[in-house]
Amino acid sequence: MNENISNESSQKFPMRPVAPLGVIAMNGCEEMGRRVNEYLMNWQVDSSSDQKLHSFYGSDKNGFLLEAHCPRFGTGEGKGMIKDTVRGYDLFIICDVGAYQCTYKLYGREIPMTPDEHYADLKRIIAAVSGKAY
């Protein structure tokens, strides 16, 4: 029985994705998003890969990162905006709710973002992705 398990686990998993891959780096995670994108781009063109991914989103010079941001209104309320189409994509959203270096303007003053506000922005992006902005 152990031989069957080890034989099955040693087989290569297919590397070809089912859907295009997209990565959204939220406010405060831009550097991490760039590193993930760089890794994916290097993996994509790696000569050891048996299946090339040139027909999928990310094979161009822009990579897998999707442009998204959450602008704030003067009252502090915000909205999630995604600049690219995401229909049919496998999305990964990178968010650091403890990124206190992120600020926004509220009544003309710079306010550091709390974990609650990062989480609210994450929910706004998820709502924008699903097409049901509330």
Language-model features: where?
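PRPP-associated nucleotide enzymes
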Residues: 1-134
